[in-house]
């Protein structure tokens, strides 16, 4: 169930084909599986089981009690009977020929008469075909006189007695015989034509009976006239002529005082039986023959008129003539009927499935599907957003420039909306290609340009260069990139308040200052590399002198080393020692003081006991995984007396155990 026509008078499609062509079973099953979890299809359900035919449906009617729906269709020719109380198919029955139209003679489906395309009338009961009778010429419509129990069959061609009139066959169902036909003027036929007449033979196209009122019969002809017969006098009482085209549809109002007729040119007229001039004239807009006319009444006692051709269903206000609402199915329509005392409309159409429309403003849902009212209220409360993904909005001047203005009101490819129309995207592309043959080359060049621009935008772009504080810009950009926030550095560059920070050298950050180095101790300054090395070396030398005052035994330091777990030594290739960079740059005449480990020269063992020697050898033979400080080389470079003020060394709390040793090499 979906909203077909949004607006002041909404129309809901309860059942009907989703495509204009019948799909094969395997493709239909695949679409059902793929649309199972589609949010738009959550309200879809099957109202009546097997409410369809193999190819198309011809006619559909509802019984007077509202419990049965009978429909005819093809192929193979057959008719279906649905039970509305069970919402399912009761039975189906095949016939010998295709059905033209049918009538329900009883309040339920038990008695029905069917007009077939092979000039036969079939009477069906629940047990089967009760009787079949053949009529002299092809019939166009059926009507039933309940007072006299007669079936009226308007036919094609002229009578056989040479009077030059068309005939309406009368079959008395009580006596089971044909009565004298009523003669209707349908014009002249070509001389020498057969019994059925020529191709252009006149015909009585349609019949209507004013039931429950005066019972006057009206017959529409192919020459644009309407003749009225009184069944009591069995004679013609009036003629209504001068209509454009053939009369294809007739319908009496409930009070029997007005008559609506439709022509083959799509014109609709409403007449008062007391006045030959029409009360209302309307145009269906499609230029197609009118198939059905139905008088309707809303719950507020407003009188409406339904008109239908094979393309669209329109409902008019009978008093003002304004369009109330409309429905445009995807397939061609063959017949339209209204479920009495409700807002539901059923159609027989060329599609496989028959349509079922529900108009809440026209009336409540039938009692056999009363749940539709609650479903409609739920759908109205939901927020709907209608999208036109496959449509292009064009104004009327734009339609004229594309030579599409002749399609206005003639196809569903143009949907009126506000001051323009929604045009189907495929039609729009074809029209543009016809009006401008070079549009494809222009579109191709445009897409290539967009692709190149997209590739350029995806490249990694460097940070904008500035005159001053370039490192500050890079640092801020890197920090913002890690946090995943917008680029604040770019905003700072564009902000005039911070303009001088990146342009004026007076705002340059001095990275060699003491404050900067205290706040950024890990920042490497290329220009002050040599000074930093010298500071470190002199600091190490002074610390060695201060620590040389104390003395301690090496044995006291061994327990701390033994607590560390030994690791497997990694064999490293021997490298040739290269002089340091600052050593290579020194002149040869400068004084250089070097300190080397005392273990390289060997110690005196003369006054040492043998046990202590063995113990020392054992300790020396242990594998030490830590850094061997005794093998380091320190180089001291004398400096001038004028020294730069050194920043105070950062004091960190001691976490290791206090040692009495003053060995400077141990602290390296």
Swiss-Prot record:
How is the subunit organization of this protein annotated in UniProt? Component of the 90S pre-ribosomes.
- Which InterPro entries does its entry note? Beta-prop_NOL10_N, NOL10/Enp2, NOL10_2nd, NUC153, WD40/YVTN_repeat-like_dom_sf, WD40_repeat_dom_sf
User: Which ranges are annotated Acidic residues under compositional bias?
Assistant: 542-556
Bias-annotated ranges (Basic and acidic residues): 557-602, 610-620
Gene Ontology cellular component list = 90S preribosome; nucleolus; small-subunit processome
> Any idea which UniProt keywords this protein has?
Nucleus, Repeat, Ribosome biogenesis, rRNA processing, WD repeat
Residue segments, region Disordered: 518-668
* Main localization, broad class: nucleus
Q: Which domain of life is it from?
A: Eukaryota
Residues making up the signal peptide according to the UniProt record: none
Homology family: Belongs to the WD repeat NOL10/ENP2 family.
Localization of this protein? Nucleus, Nucleolus
Q: What is this protein called?
A: Ribosome biogenesis protein ENP2
The UniProt function text for this chain reads: May be involved in rRNA-processing and ribosome biosynthesis.
- WD repeat ranges, renumbered to this chain: 199-239, 242-281, 288-326, 328-367, 409-450
SUPFAM superfamilies assigned to the protein according to its UniProt record, in alphabetical order: WD40 repeat-like
Q: Which GO terms describe its biological process?
A: maturation of SSU-rRNA from tricistronic rRNA transcript (SSU-rRNA, 5.8S rRNA, LSU-rRNA)
